[in-house]
């Protein structure tokens, strides 16, 4: 069970990744609604995403930001990158995340770049496989980020010392 992260104790920035116009055809014509996908993060190891739907764009964004603040995760960061390579999946989308050398920057496109920058990961390489819709990309990225573990956690799970793990 992931521990709750209080969004009120963090200085969160938000970034709108996608806005979709949804049309429902009814007897009297078309009903328009908007769906927004938003990423929030403190650029210091905490990031979340949320979606919101409403009749107007600003209201959809507000709902998405609220949802994102309730859906925060902690990302383990080693220096300026992630601890190890990981493959996140959601639906038909896959995201491969690899640690990168310091100074190489975020090599990722669109939604994945946004997640990494708001999480505070400065150096990472990614490859998007399969479905490339923004929602699938974000959810697959979050799946990958939740799989990340620090060396201390791995050593504790295996019941060995950190020195033994390094060898």
Swiss-Prot record:
<keyword id="KW-0699">rRNA-binding</keyword>
<keyword id="KW-0689">Ribosomal protein</keyword>
<dbReference type="GO" id="GO:0019843">
    <property type="term" value="F:rRNA binding"/>
</dbReference>
<dbReference type="Pfam" id="PF00333">
    <property type="entry name" value="Ribosomal_S5"/>
</dbReference>
<protein>
    <recommendedName>
        <fullName>Small ribosomal subunit protein uS5</fullName>
    </recommendedName>
</protein>
<comment type="subunit">
    <text>Part of the 30S ribosomal subunit. Contacts proteins S4 and S8.</text>
</comment>
<comment type="function">
    <text>With S4 and S12 plays an important role in translational accuracy.</text>
</comment>
<dbReference type="InterPro" id="IPR005712">
    <property type="entry name" value="Ribosomal_uS5_bac-type"/>
</dbReference>
<dbReference type="GO" id="GO:0006412">
    <property type="term" value="P:translation"/>
</dbReference>
<dbReference type="InterPro" id="IPR000851">
    <property type="entry name" value="Ribosomal_uS5"/>
</dbReference>
<comment type="similarity">
    <text>Belongs to the universal ribosomal protein uS5 family.</text>
</comment>
<keyword id="KW-0694">RNA-binding</keyword>
<comment type="function">
    <text>Located at the back of the 30S subunit body where it stabilizes the conformation of the head with respect to the body.</text>
</comment>
<feature type="domain" description="S5 DRBM">
    <location>
        <begin position="12"/>
        <end position="75"/>
    </location>
</feature>
<dbReference type="Pfam" id="PF03719">
    <property type="entry name" value="Ribosomal_S5_C"/>
</dbReference>
<dbReference type="GO" id="GO:0003735">
    <property type="term" value="F:structural constituent of ribosome"/>
</dbReference>
<dbReference type="GO" id="GO:0015935">
    <property type="term" value="C:small ribosomal subunit"/>
</dbReference>
<dbReference type="InterPro" id="IPR020568">
    <property type="entry name" value="Ribosomal_Su5_D2-typ_SF"/>
</dbReference>
<dbReference type="InterPro" id="IPR014721">
    <property type="entry name" value="Ribsml_uS5_D2-typ_fold_subgr"/>
</dbReference>
<keyword id="KW-0687">Ribonucleoprotein</keyword>
<dbReference type="InterPro" id="IPR013810">
    <property type="entry name" value="Ribosomal_uS5_N"/>
</dbReference>
<dbReference type="InterPro" id="IPR005324">
    <property type="entry name" value="Ribosomal_uS5_C"/>
</dbReference>
<dbReference type="InterPro" id="IPR018192">
    <property type="entry name" value="Ribosomal_uS5_N_CS"/>
</dbReference>
């Amino acid at each position: 069970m992931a521990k709750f992260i209080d969004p009120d104790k963090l200085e969160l920035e938000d970034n709108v990744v996608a806005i979709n116009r949804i049309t429902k055809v009814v007897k009297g014509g078309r009903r328009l609604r908007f769906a927004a996908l938003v990423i929030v993060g403190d650029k210091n190891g905490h990031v979340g995403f949320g979606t919101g739907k409403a009749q107007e764009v600003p209201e959809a964004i507000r709902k998405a930001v609220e949802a994102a603040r309730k859906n925060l995760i902690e990302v383990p960061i080693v220096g300026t990158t992630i601890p190890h390579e990981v493959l996140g999946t959601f639906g038909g989308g896959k995201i491969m995340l690899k640690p990168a050398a310091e100074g190489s920057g975020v090599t990722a496109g669109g939604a994945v770049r946004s997640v990494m920058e708001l999480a505070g990961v400065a150096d990472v390489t990614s490859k998007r496989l399969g479905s490339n819709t923004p929602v699938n990309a974000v959810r697959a990225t979050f799946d990958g980020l939740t799989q990340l573990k620090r060396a201390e956690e791995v050593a504790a799970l295996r019941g060995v010392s950190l020195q033994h793990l390094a060898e």
